[in-house]
Amino acid sequence: MASTYNSFNLHTTAEKFYIEACDDGVGDVLAIDRVSTEKTLTVRKDVPPSAVTRPICGIMGTIRLVAGVYLIVITKKKKVGDLLGHAVWKASDFDIISYKKTVLHLTDNQMQDNKVFLSMLNSVLNTDGFYFATDYDLTHTLQRLSNTSPEFQEMTLLERADQRFVWNGHLLREFMAQPELHRFVFPVIHGFIAMRSCCINGKIFDWNLISRRSCFRAGVRYYVRGIDSEGHAANFVETEQIIQYNGAKASFIQTRGSIPFYWSQRPNLKYKPKPQISKSINHLDGFQRHFDSQIIIYGKQVILNLVNQKGSEKPLEQAFAKMVGSLGNGMIKYIAFDFHKECSRMRWHRLQILVDTVAELQDEFGYFLVDSDGSVQMQQDGTFRSNCMDCLDRTNVVQSLLARRSLQSQLERMAVLHVGQRIEEQADFEKIYKNAWADNANACAKQYAGTGALKTDFTRTGKRTQWGLLMDGWNSMIRYYKNNFSDGFRQDSIDLFLGNYAVEEADMNTPLHEPKDWKFLTLPIIMVVAFSMCIICLLMAGDTWTETLAYVLFWGSASVVTGGVILFNGRDFVDAPRLVQKEKMD
């Protein structure tokens, strides 16, 4: 595999960017013309002495906004650890640099739009969880990498990457077209990585957890649900647990993703909007495309549907079960487990019912195992696909339990655990394991829902606590606010970053200028005034109590009625995406 360069210097002049590879013995320089945007290879001596120089950690890519093209670079990185001897990095800071030296050619409206688009890019880049490696392919699992051809092994990181998980793929499209530039760029994944050195029975091993978020049908909690016409599921995450000990390595893969048919749950100011299943689209086509691709990539599928089997979630569970039955594919098994019902009143021990139910299937699927001499001893031929409504809180709890069961078998096979020993009894390792899975839950939740995960007290400690319930309540309130009043901007940011919306240079008519309905400002003002008058009437009593009561009833009724009208027209008041029209299923 042709690895990419590790470190760079960015030399900036008025005419060009010069990106110098600083690896030992390398003199390659990438020159980018700031006017024509042409990219060519040159050498260090061609860099003008007058250039302003600074170190950078890598190139994220380029993107066109209203003011012209921008170069996005990684300016800070933090080492996460080593995977099979290869350094894995977390990108922690970025810079967005304009090719143009001035924005004086823009109108005031264009400059304002450009600022909004820049803030959208920063919104995505500031979402924690971008990772990369310069000499290892983070987009593939160990098992996929072991089943590749010699031709695949010779490809550059950019050419061979699994495009589902390359979050800077759109930004690198121009680099992709020039193979001679591939050593200057690398794929960046989004999700979570934890790498820990652990010890059990005096035996030191590496335990790694990698979650890769798909960039297909990416978005935020209430605006992106279900699947698209290609069968890509919302909030799809591939999670791989890797063990390395004494030259041997093992891997266990699980997936999560939104319920894979056409449904929506648009925010409307209600705490929990009612899900809507499309009545006009043929669900089975997209449903089959989704599982056909999953079977090709992961083998047999066991669906663990954790949604409620009553209330607003019940129709989704029933439709999911019906579609699996209609598909009639022996490679797919469906298991419904009403998480909230089974674990109600703090009965979290009942999760063991689900683990025991799937134990035989998990043993049948196995895991990927390579011994110390490099020979493959076992392959994982099936995957658990877990989901709840958001594929976050309930899903993460179940995935951590299944991963622990696989880990028990792996460590016994590697002779790290003695016969009869349980992972749960290894207090030091259990703390590492639970905290990493809780951190994984928080990362996935922040990226999709805007807050940390719920129920992480159980993941961290193995039991629910009063403090955990309070934190869940706080996070739920923050989610409510963000989902209703800021997620439209977040969705637009993701669509811009991933290329779902393309900005035309000097564009005069962007969707950012869509006018708000008159109700957006008028009704909230009326409600605030009416409520304020109600309070004033209570504090400043009239001549008689009947007069005071009349005023209070009038202004109180006005505020209640106005609030009711606002709730009835809830979708007019939420922050909705403007760049790409999201599907409406109702």
From Swiss-Prot:
GO terms for cellular component: endoplasmic reticulum; endoplasmic reticulum membrane; endoplasmic reticulum-plasma membrane contact site; Golgi membrane. Keywords: Endoplasmic reticulum, Golgi apparatus, Hydrolase, Membrane, Transmembrane, Transmembrane helix. It is an enzyme of class 3 (hydrolase). Residues 121-450 form the SAC domain. Its main location: endoplasmic reticulum. It is found in: Endoplasmic reticulum membrane; Golgi apparatus membrane. The keyword Membrane applies. Residues 541-547 are lumenal. Residues 1-519, 569-586 are cytoplasmic. PROSITE patterns: SAC (PS50275). It is a multi-pass membrane protein. Its EC number is 3.1.3.64. InterPro entries: SAC_dom (IPR002013). Phosphoinositide phosphatase which catalyzes the hydrolysis of phosphatidylinositol 4-phosphate (PtdIns(4)P), phosphatidylinositol 3-phosphate (PtdIns(3)P) and has low activity towards phosphatidylinositol-3,5-bisphosphate (PtdIns(3,5)P2). This is Phosphatidylinositol-3-phosphatase SAC1-B. It comes from Danio rerio. The gene is sacm1lb.
